[in-house]
Amino acid sequence: MIAIVDDDDSLRTAVQDLLEAVGLPAQGFASAEEFLNSGKQHGTACLIADIRMPGMSGLELQAHLNAERCRVPIIFITAHGDEKMRLQARREGAVEFLSKPFDNEVLLDSVRAALES
């Protein structure tokens, strides 16, 4: 299952629909806390997460998963990223960092690469 964690309902739904249209099972979560409370982090094959969200940020979610030794490939998407943020995410193990708006094919290629890693 590919988890999509983003507080933007329309983007989360669009990404879920895109993944499911190419046969990839996906589930959306409105916040990092909702994702963690679902108990599905250890059954997640790939995580697509926004960096900036109310409550726990995407980077804080990444740190939490790393502390739990939950090594899920993470693709970050953000409208407000900078180079420092990108480097921090990569240093902590993110496989990709995409700026919004992103090309659907680039996202799909990133997901496929993450699933193969």
Where are these regions (language model features)?
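Active-site beta3 strand of CheY-like receiver
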Residues: 42-48
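C-terminal output helix
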Residues: 84, 102-112
